[in-house]
Amino acid sequence: MKNKKDKTQKPKVIDEKFVAFFKSLNIEPQNWQFYEDAFVHSSYVNENEDARASYDRLEFLGDALIDFIVAKKLFELYPNYNEGMLTRTKIEIVKGENLNRIGKELNFGNFIKLGKGMPYTETLFGDVLEALVAAIYEDLGIEKANQFVEEHIFKKTYSEILKYNFFSLFQEQKLPEPRVRVSLTSNNLVLSIIELNGDIIWSQAVPNSKHYDDKSVLEHNAMSAFTQFLKSGKGINFFSDIKNKLDSQKPMRALTVRPKKINWKARKPKLKALKNKVKADS
């Protein structure tokens, strides 16, 4: 007697849209059964005898895989982060609302199989995303699973990660929340300022080589530049100096990062004029 639940059984027919979907994800399945299982809800299995399995077990494995891959990526990217910051950043990336959103953006709803009357809840998309990562791992190995997580989870949450990390840097030092200001000059420079309690603690003026004019993009770039500055080692005593000056209640002198190959004698704005310019444009 043929066992309908035989785990080596291959699906007889693979939907063309399902094949095209994986091609769009740059995935070439070797064993399609893993991927079919990843999109089957337990309610569908209960109502259909031909259904092999639900995504429950794959979801369990995928949850652990995503945690591991993201943790490893953060460990490599942020050597100066302590255990607490690494943990909080990982939680921010893999939280359910992010996974649910990504699953919806990838149009998982076109392929999820549910029992009759079962609604499409938000958490379904995140569950299937976790199951899909496990399916990729089981079929193609950790390298391909790592590639998928980095491309579709890590990169898609990078802006949120950067913003979270930027403000966490100050929270970790028990400093007030900083303010980021950006402005464009007539000679195509991007002026970026970070303020603390109204004092400028860091500023940067760089050519707007990509001609960005979106304020959110410019602020994102400013936070990224500041974070990279700290990672470079140049800012090793940055926060301790800031805290000492706050404790002594002395005016803080801004640290300015200058670009190369710019005639600063002709272009260098005075700090006061720079601050007024940004305030006027904000």
Curated annotation (Swiss-Prot):
Digests double-stranded RNA. Involved in the processing of primary rRNA transcript to yield the immediate precursors to the large and small rRNAs (23S and 16S). Processes some mRNAs, and tRNAs when they are encoded in the rRNA operon. Processes pre-crRNA and tracrRNA of type II CRISPR loci if present in the organism. Its main location: cytoplasm. PROSITE patterns: RNASE_3_1, RNASE_3_2. One of its GO terms (molecular function) is RNA binding. The lineage of its organism: Bacteria, Bacillati, Mycoplasmatota, Mycoplasmoidales, Mycoplasmoidaceae. The active site is at 63, 130. Its EC number is 3.1.26.3. It comes from Mycoplasma pneumoniae (strain ATCC 29342 / M129 / Subtype 1). The keyword tRNA processing applies. This is Ribonuclease 3.
